[in-house]
Amino acid sequence: ELGPNANILVLDAGDEFQGSLFYTQYKSGPVAEFINGIGFDAMAIGNHEFDDGPAELLKFINAAKFPIISGNTKIADGSELKDKFKGYIIKDMGGQKVGVVSVLATDTGETSSPGDKVSFEDEVAYLKGAVKELQDQGVNKIVLLSHVGYVRDQEIAREVDGIDVIVGGHSHTLLSS
């Protein structure tokens, strides 16, 4: 067991709502209950979190006991998701300010059901601004919790200065040493 001063982030890159008979039968409530016990520091919204529309995602967000983030996901006025999640979090870890920022694939409107009040800003454009905003707040360690896929993660790594680590999802690409 890790001590209380362990400098560890527990992150989820999204897509908890897909691929199992369990989710198909029971939806987000039991999923939230189960993963609340894991102790995540943050979770990215994946495209499949929108599979049953914004209302089911809202139920999950309300049940979650950890921050759910997605910075380039833009919510229009009148949506039940308005102001329900942030683009990033800042954690104090061993006296260091660590930022965790998240983006979601811009084609989510085609791969899922986000509804007409949800749109997706270009990942690189959003991240350049978010990294600067985090750095302006004294953050010098930035983790990207990404749900855009391995190829896009590599492009982001080349195009956005200031990101130290990318924890990526979406493409389900196995990386080994």
Task: Go through each PLM region and give its residues.
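Acidic, metal/ion-coordinating pockets
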Residues: 1-177
